[in-house]
């Protein structure tokens, strides 16, 4: 069975999906789910990417099965590493994705991250990701490596191995 292993519900600031709707959609597609609510301490802006893991498990544990698992997506930042690790250790998560959503403390969604040329910005992104995933040794999965490509203002947004394999 295939699984969608990166899915947010109402416990994430960027989703309003109910677990019931997620399960119904998964059944229609004949796939399993791993819910991965956002945990991104000290995220800039108005949205709070934090949730109560005890409440999460209290509400959702009865749905756990061979086709539904409960996880978390941790936003990686060096200064929140210890806090994030304690959070992950506070509950029996089935899966832990660690992702890079910020670069030098700035949200990759905004053009203010892209003041340098593409190679410089992407190299900083990749080097930061490598450094942080090594520190976040509690991760099972490194999330969306190409996240920067969604929002970068460059004509050619893709990360190409040929451009970075020597650096």
Across the structure, where does each feature detected by a protein language model lie?
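Domain-core and long-helix interface of multi-subunit machines
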Residues: 11-13, 97-167
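An N-terminally biased module of ancient metal coordination in phosphate/nucleic-acid-related enzymes
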Residues: 1-78, 149-162, 166
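Active-site gating/metal-coordination segments in enzymes
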Residues: 11, 61-69, 73-120
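Short amphipathic alpha-helices and their capping/turn segments at secondary-structure boundaries
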Residues: 19-28, 79-93, 125-139, 164-167
């Amino acid at each position: 069975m295939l699984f969608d292993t990166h899915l947010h519900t109402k416990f994430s600031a960027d989703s309003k999906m109910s677990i019931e709707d997620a399960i119904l959609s998964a059944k229609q597609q004949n796939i399993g789910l791993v819910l991965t609510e956002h945990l991104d301490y000290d995220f800039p802006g108005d949205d709070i990417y934090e949730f109560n893991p005890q409440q999460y498990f209290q509400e959702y544990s009865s749905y756990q099965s061979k086709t539904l698992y409960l996880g978390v997506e941790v936003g990686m930042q060096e200064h929140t590493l210890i806090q994030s690790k304690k959070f992950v250790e506070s509950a029996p998560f089935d899966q832990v994705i660690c992702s890079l959503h910020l670069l030098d403390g700035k949200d990759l969604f905004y053009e203010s991250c892209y003041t340098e040329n593409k190679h410089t910005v992407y190299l900083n992104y990749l080097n930061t990701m490598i450094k942080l995933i090594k520190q976040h040794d509690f991760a099972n999965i490194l999330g969306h490596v190409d996240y920067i490509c969604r929002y970068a203002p460059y004509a050619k947004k893709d990360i190409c191995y040929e451009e970075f394999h020597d650096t």
